[in-house]
């Protein structure tokens, strides 16, 4: 293991953390429709719980309406019930086999609650990145202890990892601000 390996591993893991955070943000409902919002809703299908996207075509009808077209005829009522019982606050309407899921406008209290959720998810992502930084720093200190690198190399490694950490945390903060602005936009 070298300093370059430590840096590369940190960059890869922090990129995965950001991608995970982005997918987490997509699941948070804003006033706009987004097909990914139904990914967390599961429905029973032949004895096992599966995501709605595995048993139906989920698409957008317009900016505020999601369309759900089940692939099997009997799944419509089950999907409708699963969406209604989810904690998303959605109320689907059935038109034959097609389900329309209108996105209700968010009230001010719900918007504030969602911004708190976004901030909490952002803090969790920052903690994950800080843990990655700690692991990278521990590896550099271990290399120094094993006399594989000099103290100058260790200090340089710690500085580089800190700069990468600052950049990743700034990206997370930017994503949090962007999502909050999206939620608070009326």
From Swiss-Prot:
One of its GO terms (molecular function) is ribosomal large subunit binding. Pfam families: RRF (PF01765). InterPro entries: Ribosome_recyc_fac, Ribosome_recyc_fac_dom, RRF_sf. It is found in: Cytoplasm. One of its GO terms (biological process) is cytoplasmic translational termination. PANTHER family: MITOCHONDRIAL RIBOSOME RECYCLING FACTOR PSEUDO 1 (PTHR20982:SF3), RIBOSOME RECYCLING FACTOR (PTHR20982). Belongs to the RRF family. Responsible for the release of ribosomes from messenger RNA at the termination of protein biosynthesis. May increase the efficiency of translation by recycling ribosomes from one round of translation to another. This is Ribosome-recycling factor. It comes from Methylibium petroleiphilum (strain ATCC BAA-1232 / LMG 22953 / PM1). The lineage of its organism: Bacteria, Pseudomonadati, Pseudomonadota, Betaproteobacteria, Burkholderiales.
């Amino acid at each position: 293991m070298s300093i370059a390996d430590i840096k590369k591993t940190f960059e890869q893991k922090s990129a995965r953390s950001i991608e995970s955070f982005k997918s987490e943000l997509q699941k948070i409902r804003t006033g706009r429709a987004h097909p990914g919002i139904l990914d967390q809703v599961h429905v029973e299908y032949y004895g096992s719980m599966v995501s709605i996207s595995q048993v139906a075509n989920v698409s957008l009808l317009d900016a505020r309406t999601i369309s759900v077209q089940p692939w099997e005829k009997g799944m419509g009522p089950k999907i409708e019930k699963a969406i209604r019982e989810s904690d998303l606050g959605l109320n689907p309407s059935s038109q034959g086999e097609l389900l329309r899921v209108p996105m209700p406008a968010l009230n001010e209290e719900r918007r504030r609650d969602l911004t708190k959720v976004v901030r909490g998810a952002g803090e969790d992502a920052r903690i994950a990145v800080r843990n990655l930084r700690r692991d990278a720093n521990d590896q550099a200190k271990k290399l120094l202890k094993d006399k594989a690198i000099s103290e100058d190399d260790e200090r340089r490694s710690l500085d580089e990892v800190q700069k990468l950490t600052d950049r990743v945390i700034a990206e997370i903060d930017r994503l949090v601000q962007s999502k909050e602005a999206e939620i608070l936009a009326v």
